[in-house]
A protein has these predicted regions:
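The feature captures the beta-strand-to-loop junction immediately N-terminal to the Walker
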Residues: 43-45
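Helix-to-loop junction immediately C-terminal to a conserved catalytic motif
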Residues: 58
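Conserved signature/switch motifs of ABC ATPase nucleotide-binding domains
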Residues: 134-137, 155
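Hydrophobic anchor residue at the start of the ABC signature
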Residues: 149
């Protein structure tokens, strides 16, 4: 893959050495290209390397083999070009909402007036304009994830990496956050990669959806889907009524179920 623009993952493999002298092949020969502005969800059974892949893209881990390039430059470590949103917001609880969102720009030496303007705009965008001076610990889980999204965007990343950011939320809050992610994707034009264990969420929040298989972690199948674009303008509950949604949901659930059964069979054979 030689395309300079976007995110390129080339022949990526990751092996973890174990204390007993053995090793675990977490990822093997992963190849992928994302154009700037694409929204991709990544799904698969536990142990398929989803989070490992995201951590390598973020620069938190160095791959055993292969490389990742963003806009033609090799990823060698963490960078403001790649923002991360975790399942738990990882916010500074002793700071106000405003201070959390403005922390990154402040560390970069951005002028105070520019920070205030950016923070105000982002908090209005995520629906927290009336909570700017609140302490983070006063907010609900869903509101904290909105702060985490705004804080990520404040750093101006080209790529937003989301590691199961909605997994701990109740159903109603989760649906509202899914709609917000789609809104931000369309308004900002950012490239977004979202890891999830939910087939439904992967379908709704991925114009491209990767299904990964385990042992070793690899890309098993890729789908191109219409639901994310539909969800920008429609209620997500209406999107779920789309006939192709039910068809793909059952297909992918069956695929992952078969993977889980295969894993259990291997474990029983080894015991």
């Amino acid at each position: 893959m030689t395309t300079d623009h976007g995110l390129n993952i080339n022949n990526l493999s990751m092996r973890f050495d174990l204390p007993n002298g053995g090793s675990v092949q977490a990822l093997k020969n992963v190849n992928l290209h994302l154009k700037s502005g694409e929204l991709m969800s990544v799904l698969g059974p536990s142990g398929c390397g989803k989070t490992t892949l995201l951590n390598i893209i973020a620069g938190f881990l160095a791959p055993t083999e292969g490389e990742i390039q963003l806009n033609g430059s090799t990823v060698t470590g963490p960078s403001a070009e790649r923002g991360m949103v975790f399942q738990q917001g990882a916010l500074f609880e002793w700071m106000s909402v405003r201070e959390n969102v403005g922390f990154g720009p402040k560390m970069k030496g951005t002028p105070r007036g520019e920070i205030r303007e950016t923070v105000d705009h982002l908090l209005d965008t995520v629906g927290l304009g009336d909570f700017k001076e609140k302490a983070v610990y006063e907010l609900s889980g869903g509101m904290q994830q909105r702060v985490a999204l705004a804080r990520c965007l404040a750093n101006g990343p080209d790529v937003i990496l989301m590691d199961e950011p909605l997994g701990a939320l109740d159903a109603l809050t989760r649906e509202k956050m899914q709609s917000l992610v789609l809104k931000l994707w369309k308004e900002t034009g950012k490239t977004i990669i979202l890891i999830t264990h939910s087939v439904e969420e992967a379908l709704l929040l991925g114009e491209r959806l990767l299904v990964m298989a385990p042992r070793p972690g690899r890309i098993h199948r890729e789908y191109r889907l219409p639901f994310a674009d539909l969800g920008v303008d429609q209620d997500l509950r209406e999107v779920k009524k789309h006939p192709e949604y039910a068809e793909k949901r059952e297909e992918i659930l069956s695929m992952i179920w078969d993977m889980e059964e295969e894993i259990m069979g291997r474990m029983e054979a080894q015991s």
